[in-house]
Amino acid sequence: MDAVELPAFSEAVLSPANGALAAMTGFGNSFATEAVRGALPVARNSPQQAPLGLYAEQLSGSAFTAPRQSNKRIWFYRIRPSVLHGRNFREIECGLIRTAPCRDESSLPIGQLRWQPTPLPDAPTDFLDGLRTMATCGDVFTQVGFASHVYVANRSMDRRYFCTADGEFLLVPQQGRIEVFTECGRLVAAPGEIVIVPKGMKFKIDLPDGQAGGPVRGYVAENYGHYLTLPERGPIGANCLANARDFLTPTAAYEDHEAACELIMKSQGRLYHTTLPHSPLDVVAWHGNFAPCKYDLRRFSPVGSVMFDHPDPSIYTVLTAASDTPGTANLDFVIFPERWLVMENSFRPPWYHMNVMSEFMGLIYGVYDAKPGGFVPGGMSLHNALLPHGPDADAFAKASTKTLAPERLSGTLAFMFETRYPLCPTGYASELDTLDTMYPDCWEKLERKFKV
């Protein structure tokens, strides 16, 4: 029986020939793209001979038999297969990178914690050199929890590449632009944007603005558990919050460098190094739904109270990673964006709270309304489960007495990594000079006002 002839149709999005950045829209879509016309096979994943002499290779992000709605995989068509990347690994020091379980490094007593911004480096420092862990939770061996990192850098990753088998990376730039060059292509992100890099995908981070742009700084959540996805909207309906159309996935881009380079692999909390004779970012075409993406947080459409009371912060959830308990996240990524406050006869800042979840917060820019002093851009706070927190004394006094009129919170963007698991500060975080030991004093002036 003769082979069935297939129509010569390709669904691939062709990258710009001039190397300009381009992206495809949607969240969790099955994308198809090629950097060279004809590089993506038509109607087959693994033809007997892949086009242009490329190798076909699959990266699985889930078990083969995972339900269709959660099944993740991507097909690469690359110059050399990844089996050439995995030889001669040797373990190297982890530096300031830590992985859960990591419970015994800190001797800090329980309490509300806050740090001033991580200092920017003077010595040459790339993203991997400047990555350091502030807190961890869960257990990478059972694939639950996450690590909260910060990064600082003043140079690009020159002939240096990174891959983590422990979790997906959620990158949150706070100062300066970064270019994330993955096996799928290139994404540039500035403060106010985020990037997700899938687990097991090789990438490097460059500074597209060079020395003129100055050093960069930001936050990272390394998610060990179920992958981040868009939260259910429930009674909100079909619109608002983060809309899938606003997520951008890169079109194919590749490096064809025949020069020695370094690949660092993170696995089971350890770092391993190997030397390659060529760049591992040599994917000329790809298709699938396990791909990196970026999102502009300013496109988040917030909802809120239009009459009275401050709603729960969960209404500002951008992304969520489920745990085994419905509605109780392994990791939520929540933002506090620009918005209107119109509630009548109500205390408008976030209220005083003891949360069964643990909260790691950062400020990307502007002023956070519950902490107008002391919590500055680049800073961080950690409120573990059931530790009380809330507006400082000055914020309480102002919000309790001001004349209420419609008010726009402008020029502000804070975020929160929230988890069901207790967050353990690392030894590095516990010993930093930037640890604000006076933080609990911000509530000291809250006076007794009870009268009968």
Predicted regions and their residues:
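Jelly-roll (double-stranded beta-helix
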Residues: M1-V452
